[in-house]
C-alpha cells in the first residue's frame, strides 16, 4: 500500500509520496534572494533552518496567481536538503495499491518540466499526476542551493 499527498496547481491534481513530505505549512513571509532563478520565490527560516522556496507554478510553466488562504508549502527533502514547494492547495492523502499508478504517456512526459512526472492515477472523476520530488529541480538544484546559502 502506497500513500500520496495530493495537491492542486491550477485545475490539476498532483501527488507526491507521503514519505517525501516532511511537513505542510502555511505561507510565511518569504525573503527574496538576489539573482535567483525565476522559479525560486526566495527563502524562509523554518525553525532555524534556511529553506529555499520554489514556485511549482513557475516550475511547471503555469501562470502566476496571488497566494490565498488555501496556498501551502510542501516541505520535502530533496537531495538530502529541505526544500519548500508552493502549491495552490493540499487536498488529501490518498491510499493506493501498488499497481494503480500507470506510466505517463510519452507526449506528456517529455520536456524539461515534465521530467519529474512519473505516473498517472485514475482518481475518482479526474486524473492525478504523480510527481517525483527528487526530479523537481533536476539540473537546476545546485543553483537553487547556491543562491540560498
Language model features with spans:
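An acidic, low-aromatic, low-complexity terminal/linker signal
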Residues: 1-149
